[in-house]
Every structure is written in C-alpha cells, then in structure tokens.
A protein has these predicted regions:
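Long, contiguous binding/interaction regions
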Residues: 1-56, 63-111
C-alpha cells in the first residue's frame, strides 16, 4: 500500500471526473477513520471528527491543518469548538472526490 501522505496534492481545474464508488472504496482503505458522506447534491465528501482535551488543543490542530492546506493548495471545510474538530474534504471544482482529497486526509492524519 502506498503512503498517500508522501504524495503532493494536484490542483484540479475541473477537467477530471470525480471518483466513482469503487475508486472511493479503494482509496478509503488507505486512510484511517475517515467516512464518506453525500452533500445535498449527492456528491461525495470525506469527513472525520477529531477529539481533543480542550479548546486550545482543537485550535492548535486547526492551525496545523491550515498550514498543510496552504502548502498543498487544497483547502478543507473546518469547524471546531471545545474538544473537537470536524474536517470535511472534497474537490470543489468537480463536486466530488479525487486522489488529492485522500492525500490531504492522509497528511492531516500525520499531525
């Protein structure tokens, strides 16, 4: 199994199709603890909730995720509060999932 966290996210200009369910399940096996859900338009996204001891730990984690997102030019939706951080990842340009989404998830898991 390749280590997705060592790959680089590739910018998407919308010229590729989103992953189908078989591709999603293949890549989902390469990341730990992430779930696949549907947006209102039925497109897929990755989601994971991280737990922390307090607000400060959550905020520090968000800052680290933000740094990775900037390095990779791939930006997740983030919500956080006392003791938690929820990360939602998908490729906006294709309204679905692509390899870069799984790469970003793997990099976040390395924090």
């Amino acid at each position: 199994m390749s280590d997705l966290s060592k790959k680089k996210c590739v910018a998407c200009d919308g010229n590729i199709p989103p992953f189908d369910t078989s591709e999603i399940h293949k890549y989902l096996k390469k990341i730990d603890g992430w779930d696949v859900k549907n947006n209102e338009d039925k497109s897929y996204y990755l989601i994971k909730i991280f737990k922390f001891k307090n607000f400060e730990e959550s905020q520090n984690f968000v800052n680290k995720v933000g740094h990775i997102a900037e390095e990779e030019s791939h930006h997740p939706d983030i919500s956080f509060g006392w003791g938690y951080c929820k990360i939602k990842i998908f490729t906006h340009a294709i309204k679905g999932l692509a390899e870069s989404d799984f790469i970003l998830a793997a990099k976040i898991d390395k924090i």
